[in-house]
C-alpha cells in the first residue's frame, strides 16, 4: 500500500511539473505571437482551412 501511495504521489508531482512547463511555453508562444502579426494571420488561416475544405467538398456553406 505504501509503494502504491508513493507511486501515485510521484505521478501527481510529475504531472504538475509537466502542466506548469506547458503553461509557461504556451505563455511564451502567446507573447511571440503578439509581437508578430503575420504569424497570427497564419494561425487563423490554419484554423479555417479545414472548414473551407469541408465546405467545398460537401457544398453546405
Swiss-Prot record:
InterPro entries per UniProt: Frog_antimicrobial_propeptide (IPR004275)
Cysteines joined through disulfide linkages: 55-61
The organism's place on the tree of life at top rank: Eukaryota
Signal peptide: 1-22
One GO process term, biological-process aspect: defense response to Gram-negative bacterium
Tagged with keyword GTP-binding: no
GO cellular component, one term: extracellular region
Location in the cell: Secreted
UniProt keyword Cell wall biogenesis/degradation, yes or no: no
Tissue expression from the record: Expressed by the skin glands.
Record keywords, A-Z: Amphibian defense peptide, Antibiotic, Antimicrobial, Cleavage on pair of basic residues, Disulfide bond, Secreted, Signal
Pfam entry (one): FSAP_sig_propep
Propeptide feature ranges: 23-45
Sequence similarity: Belongs to the frog skin active peptide (FSAP) family. Brevinin subfamily.
Protein purpose: Antimicrobial peptide. Has low activity against the Gram-positive bacterium S.aureus (MIC>100 uM) and the Gram-negative bacterium E.coli (MIC=25 uM). Lacks hemolytic activity against human erythrocytes.
Protein name: Japonicin-1CDYa
Organism annotation: Rana dybowskii (Dybovsky's frog)
Organism lineage: Eukaryota, Metazoa, Chordata, Craniata, Vertebrata
